[in-house]
Amino acid sequence: MPKVTLQEIIGKVEQLPQLPQVALRVSRMMEESATNAEKLSDVIRLDPSFTSQVLRLCNSAAYGFSRRISTVKEAVAILGHSTLKSMVYTIIAKVALDRPVPGYSLSEGDLWYNALTCAVYAKHIGHRERLPDPEVAFTGGLLRDIGKIVLGDFVGANYAEIEALTTKERIDFLDAEERVIGFNHSIVGTRVAEKWNLPPVLVNVIRHHHKPVKLPPTLPPAEAKMISIVHLADALTSMVGKGAGNDGLMYCLDADALMRVGINIQGDYLERLIGELVDLNPIIKDLAESMSIAGDN
């Protein structure tokens, strides 16, 4: 079968459903240093559904506030810039990812739940490894596999050949995708990220999370460490999380790349970390349920 053309990929990207415009506007405002809490509150209130989702997330167990948050202004003030930003991307990601992707054997909700799981795991590891801003790791984990919503049909049509290649040549699923189709879901994901005008740090997560060994040497150390943490969270999500597709266990955990950013997974590191992540699964379930109820409003 001939490889997929760039024009076919771009065509699929252009067919993606419209994302919530107020959420996109807020995400872009938060990339601007001049934006203040009052301006953000005013824009969020323009969309009642988006407002409802923000408030429901604020009051979920995942955020653990001791009192109920009842207004957008209060939410913006209490959450802080970084947490609000990751919350907005959570709402955007649900719209984009909460769909079946049969090419990867993902039923409706699987890709979304997997993304949410990886996000929570990445944030936890980010705190553990003292990242300057673990919320960026959360957002990176959330959006890392957005390329699958575009590449899924092509993977489905070529899955037998891709799987056979992983076995025959002992390569991971990402490399086999590219060999058979001409693209992989990380490359395609960067196209989606650019269409949505995501910030460069998130584009880099999407492009490199499976292969942190290929990170550009010019990348700031904190960003390189964050992407490596998403790489680790991605691997552990496939092991102990939910929603992994037919490619879930066909990737390699790059211990050397992790070591280069100061994360040593030798000894009982992984065993202890997995225990911590399993304890987070009820919080992930509550977060997913909060989003589901909010989406029905």
Predicted regions and their residues:
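Terminal helices and disordered tails flanking the catalytic cores of nucleotide-processing hydrolases
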Residues: M1-E8, A255-N297
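Conserved alpha-helical "signature site"
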Residues: M1-L253, M291-D296
